[in-house]
């Protein structure tokens, strides 16, 4: 009979931990060993061919981490904000159960006798008397103590009367840290978070380095850098030349759109104030035709004529639209608006196709992801185009200010009873001061503004025709027989039964309603009525600056905070502005409030323009960017058309209430999409509990099936 003594082995080896428990429960990139750490094995061969070993990766990771950690204050702010958002439930907590495993060489076994000498005698120190010992003596000897086998070796399975001859027996005691029975064994529990643990991760810096080293973004940068270094001189020069041409075409396209929409946005903001009901009706026709034609016309025009010719024809239609605005009548404005809406759908569709093709070509030359490059190019494009809102409004206000004598004197410090949310449907109910502020400008001044916008459109067409390069595939498409492609229309009908798509429709329509409110209601009932038509451009320029800056900033912020905080921020800002306009007794002396409301509205509009468009891309899929942009443009244009139609039939207060409830409905739909899986599971569970499944038929009934 062989016995195992206490000093011969480690006590915890007796627990007999299974081999499966030593593996990571959720293997990640950081929980693999040696060569498996190389980005999921499929890229390991490519990295080895490029000469990127483990040492090179670690060196590059340390260098990049040193560059990233130059501002610890910003890093602490980022971590604190993420933790607060997780506490409030705005973003989900990341659960990472991975265990870092490392492969080391086995340590050779060293016999203990060569280093230590066992004592020949053991002495037991006398114990201090305690009443607890009296109770222990009365216990039965055969009572099984928890964890006793950990301290008695293999003698636990034998008789208790056997005593070791050379070693004093040890009284079994309860181990609080026993991994099986101990009360203080490691259990998954929520730990208290202090400021120190908040600023510094629980894991050490080495683990964080490993997670960064073997991240796909980091490895993609190294692979791109290595592939560029391996290119020959001729190939590198040719690739750089093509990339410079692509970037120049992108900036040329952006500047041409800047001049075009400088004219269109500036004239659009004056329609309801200068042309009255004719202006709102023409905008309804324009955006309704844009929404409908976006399903059929753009694909046919692009395939038949190519992107560049589509741009030029659309610019010519915009030119005719502005010319007709010199002498606006119902018989001329409504048809011109319909054709302008069709041209708008074509020019936006051609823009998406042109930028997408440039992004794909640039990504192949620069060894980057196509989606990353396309999104970056769209960001550059809209950064330039949104500045057109600023320039166009500044042009109109500057020309109007030179001609209006009222602009020389300041606004009166009094409450305007017929302006703001109390703006009447019948203009005859306006006060004399409000009526003078909304008086149509002299024809010469209005013609001067339109001529300035015509010059911008001509410059846009010249830039597009002389400097923009045509796509190579446009020449191939023109040789093929073209016909109307109804694929997008069929896809639109097919996705009408998709629950997720329909849940996002109310928020997209609200995006159109809030734009129509700002262009058609705020410019007339608030700014024009209180300050005068000559001030509309200045206030809308403030909106344009805020919209452009926030559209540029909110794009990268989604990577830090996620989609939910940005949507909540935009909704809260819009709700506050709507409530403010509903209770604000308009006083023209409070000039700052007009600009603050426009700036805050621009912040919210920056959220909707960037995030809703990206949300449609996420739902539809990045493989069909054209269809995603078409769906977004369709529902947004439909919302704008509905908004301009409501201006004729409801008061300002009712319009604000409709916008308020549409925003609440849209946010409910957005929250339902974000928690769609949980809602479906709850719904199935509710149906299963309320309507249990029927018992299977017996053999007699099954014969009749």
UniProtKB/Swiss-Prot annotation:
Record-annotated membrane-spanning stretches: 241-261, 277-297, 300-320, 325-345, 367-387, 442-462, 496-516, 520-540, 561-581, 583-603, 622-642, 648-668
Domain of life of the organism encoding this protein: Eukaryota
Extracellular compartment segments: 262-276, 321-324, 388-441, 517-519, 582, 643-647
Outcome after substituting residue 49 to V: In n200; confers 'rubber band' muscle contraction
Keyword field contains Repeat: no
Tissue: Low levels in body-wall muscles, eight vulval muscles, intestinal muscles and a subset of head neurons.
Any Pfam family the entry gives: UNC-93
Membrane topology of the entry: Multi-pass membrane protein
Subcellular location: Cell membrane
Annotated segments matching region Disordered: 1-34
Note: Gain of function phenotype is phenocopied by exposure to the unc-49 agonist muscimol.
Family of this protein: Belongs to the unc-93 family.
Name used for this protein in its record: Putative potassium channel regulatory protein unc-93
Organism: Caenorhabditis elegans
């Amino acid at each position: 009979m062989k016995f195992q003594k206490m000093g011969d082995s480690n006590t915890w080896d007796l627990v007999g931990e299974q081999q499966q428990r030593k593996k990571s429960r959720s293997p990640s990139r950081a929980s693999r060993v040696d060569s498996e750490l190389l980005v999921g094995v499929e890229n390991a061969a490519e990295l080895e061919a490029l000469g990127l070993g483990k040492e090179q990766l670690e060196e590059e990771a340390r260098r990049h981490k040193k560059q990233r950690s130059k501002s610890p204050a910003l890093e602490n702010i980022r971590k604190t904000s993420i933790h607060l958002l997780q506490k409030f439930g705005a973003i989900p907590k990341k659960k990472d159960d991975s265990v870092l495993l490392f492969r080391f060489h086995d340590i050779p076994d060293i016999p203990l006798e060569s280093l230590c000498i066992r004592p020949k005698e053991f002495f037991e120190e006398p114990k201090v008397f305690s009443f607890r010992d009296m109770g222990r003596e009365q216990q039965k000897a055969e009572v099984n103590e928890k964890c006793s086998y950990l301290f008695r070796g293999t003698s636990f399975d034998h008789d208790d009367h056997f005593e070791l001859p050379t070693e004093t027996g040890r009284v079994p005691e309860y181990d609080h840290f026993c991994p099986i029975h101990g009360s203080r064994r490691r259990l998954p529990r929520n730990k208290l978070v202090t400021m120190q643990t908040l600023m510094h991760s629980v894991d050490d810096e080495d683990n964080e380095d490993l997670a960064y080293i073997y991240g796909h973004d980091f490895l993609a940068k190294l692979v791109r850098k290595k592939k560029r270094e391996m290119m020959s001189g001729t190939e590198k020069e040719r690739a750089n030349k093509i990339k410079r041409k692509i970037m120049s075409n992108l900036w040329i396209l952006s500047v041409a759109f800047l001049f075009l929409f400088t004219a269109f946005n500036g004239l659009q903001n004056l329609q309801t104030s200068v042309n009255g009901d004719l202006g709102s009706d023409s905008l309804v026709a324009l955006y309704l035709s844009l929404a409908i034609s976006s399903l059929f016309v753009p694909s046919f025009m692009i395939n038949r004529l190519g992107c560049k010719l589509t741009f030029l024809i659309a610019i010519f239609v915009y030119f005719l639209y502005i010319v007709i605005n010199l002498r606006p009548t119902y018989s001329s404005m409504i048809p011109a608006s319909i054709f302008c809406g069709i041209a708008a759908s074509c020019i936006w569709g051609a823009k998406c196709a042109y930028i997408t093709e440039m992004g794909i070509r640039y990504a192949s030359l620069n060894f980057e992801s196509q989606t990353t490059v396309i999104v970056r190019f769209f960001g550059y494009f809209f950064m330039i185009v949104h500045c057109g809102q600023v320039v166009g409004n500044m042009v109109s206000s500057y020309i109007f200010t030179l001609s209006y004598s009222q602009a020389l004197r300041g606004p009166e410090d009094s409450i305007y009873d017929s302006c703001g949310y109390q703006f009447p449907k019948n203009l005859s109910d306006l006060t004399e001061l409000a009526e003078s502020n909304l008086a149509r400008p002299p024809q010469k001044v209005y013609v001067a503004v339109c001529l300035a916008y015509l010059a911008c459109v001509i410059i846009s067409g010249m830039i597009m025709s002389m400097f923009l390069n045509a796509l190579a595939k446009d020449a191939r498409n023109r040789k093929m027989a073209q016909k109307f492609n109804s694929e997008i229309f069929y896809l639109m009908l097919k996705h009408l039964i998709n629950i997720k798509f329909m849940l996002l429709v109310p928020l997209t329509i609200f995006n159109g309603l809030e734009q129509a409110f700002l262009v058609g209601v705020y410019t007339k009932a608030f700014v024009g009525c209180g300050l005068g038509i000559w001030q509309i451009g200045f206030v809308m320029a403030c909106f344009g600056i805020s919209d452009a800056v926030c559209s540029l900033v909110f794009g990268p912020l989604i990577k830090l905070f996620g989609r939910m905080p940005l949507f909540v921020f935009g909704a809260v800002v819009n709700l506050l502005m709507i409530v403010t306009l509903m209770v604000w007794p308009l006083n023209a002396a409070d000039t700052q409030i007009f600009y603050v409301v426009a700036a805050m509205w621009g912040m919210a509009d920056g959220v909707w323009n960037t995030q809703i468009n990206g949300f449609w891309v996420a739902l539809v899929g990045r493989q069909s960017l054209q269809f995603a942009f078409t769906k977004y443009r369709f529902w947004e244009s439909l919302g704008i058309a509905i908004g301009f139609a409501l201006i004729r039939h409801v008061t300002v207060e009712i319009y604000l209430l409709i916008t308020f409830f549409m925003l609440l409905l849209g946010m409910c739909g957005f929250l339902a999409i974000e928690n769609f899986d949980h809602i479906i599971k709850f719904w199935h569970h509710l149906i299963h509990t309320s309507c249990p499944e029927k018992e299977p038929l017996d053999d007699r009934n099954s014969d009749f099936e």
